[in-house]
């Protein structure tokens, strides 16, 4: 199943942490494409440093919740703490879309409910998949 995963980091060594996260994703899934890294301003939350963001396209046989567990395990291994909503982080891995799966479950909403509002997701995704369609919306090039 094709999965779209957004990555972000803004404390510690963001580039190194994202490189390690991608390497760990390669161990757990088949990474098909990785965007360039983008420097972006934080959205919401407390005052904090700019983020480094990217998007990966993965191929995975894991069920969506199992893939989410892999992403959260990678975050934990890289020191992710969930103390402050939209606060600074060593790494953030968000499952944006998983095949054509639609989910409103509390533990996993798909597609990601705010992806269509987040330029730091849309621009890197467009770079590696210009014809992508965000389910429940339109082509990402039109957002």
Annotate the PLM regions:
Residues 59:
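Extracellular and analogous surface-interaction loops
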């Amino acid at each position: 199943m094709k999965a779209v995963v957004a990555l972000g980091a803004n404390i510690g060594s963001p580039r190194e942490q994202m490189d390690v996260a991608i390497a760990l994703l390669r161990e757990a899934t088949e990474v098909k494409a990785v965007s360039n890294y983008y420097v972006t301003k934080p959205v919401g939350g407390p005052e904090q440093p700019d983020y480094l963001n990217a998007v990966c396209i993965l191929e995975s046989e894991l069920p969506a919740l199992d893939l989410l567990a892999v992403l959260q395990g990678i975050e934990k291994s890289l020191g992710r703490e969930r103390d402050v909503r939209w606060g600074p982080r060593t790494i953030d891995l968000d499952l944006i879309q998983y095949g054509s799966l639609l989910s409103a479950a509390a533990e996993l909403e798909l597609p990601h409910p705010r992806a269509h509002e987040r330029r730091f997701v849309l621009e890197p995704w467009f770079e590696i998949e210009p014809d992508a369609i965000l389910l429940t919306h339109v082509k990402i090039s039109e957002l």
